[in-house]
């Protein structure tokens, strides 16, 4: 509609009538894994409105229009269940682009006998977690920087469930931590296939240093009667339960990618990442939670200890870290990309890569030049309805076992959602 036409001033007000476009997604998946069928159902509302909850007329089927994101998801099989909820508001306060986010999740895994197929629901491990965070776009040094902060809590409960990750199978652990991250993203044109720019994130996660004020001498726990077995020897299970009642740690991570356009649409992606998990108190040691597991496709597989999966093509999953996980790792990669099509309905591009990486148990063992190498080719397909899908064929140039001189050989990796 045209309003306030001013022939003398040469101005006119144009009023557009807008209709909300549906941006919601429903996820229904089913599959077979771990000798059991697994199903998931989820719903995401990407233009949700909290203000409209009280307005009965706004429920069509849910209140929409404020750009908030609401997600609900359930995944389950015979012995594994995950419930999750998240809410994000990109314009918290309404005046500046400050993002507020909150989430809640509950995971429970029962004892499962893979030989008989029986499930014992009296034996289980569960994790209940919640977080709240704020992220703000910065203007200094430039407009591409974002500062984010979050506070999170996880409650671990083991009921007669020995995972092999800890010396105890009966006990509880609490994890209260604060995370601060500085990120910069100036990738331009297509976010699925950047032709230039860079993106990086530097983050630090801290727990409280409980050992500074709780008065516990963790190095002498084995000398106390309550932490000894019937023979008077130190009971490591009881000692670890005391050590990990409240988790104490700090975690530093860096991840960065640079995109260089060589010619036409041939792009070189240079990528580097690093992570370190440390302890405040040497007598308490590094926690068995939140460790790094390097190798393979990087997809989580019933991870009940907060472990962080790091992809490394050309090698089996988690094969470049010890059984208990790494406390420090690094990874470097070079990737040549060329698009087949970049249409809105589907973006497809091929790639070839070389990369190296390695996980280490202790900081004193860290050597960035002692890395496993790989090379290979891959394909990526992005469709709005399905997200990012892909496949990589990687050739491990080194052996997983340092005493073996033969290369690991070919590995096939499937990509669902995540980037390498």
Feature annotation, model-predicted:
Residues 1-193, 198-199, 310, 325, ...:
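Gram-negative/organellar outer-membrane beta-barrel architecture
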Residues 7-10, 14, 24-35, 44, ...:
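C-terminal outer-membrane beta-barrel translocator/porin domains of Gram-negative envelope proteins
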Residues 130, 250-252, 330, 371, ...:
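Hydrophobic alpha-helical membrane-association signature
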Residues 138-145, 260-268, 343-345, 387:
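Secondary-structure transition into beta-strands, especially the periplasmic turns and strand N-termini
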Residues 335-343, 366-367, 380:
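Hydrophobic alpha-helical bundle architecture
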Residues 341, 357-359, 384-386, 396-400:
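Short Gly/Pro-enriched loop/turn and capping motifs at secondary-structure junctions
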Residues 346-352, 367:
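Generic long, charged, amphipathic alpha-helical segments
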Residues 362, 368-383, 389, 401:
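Strand-loop-strand
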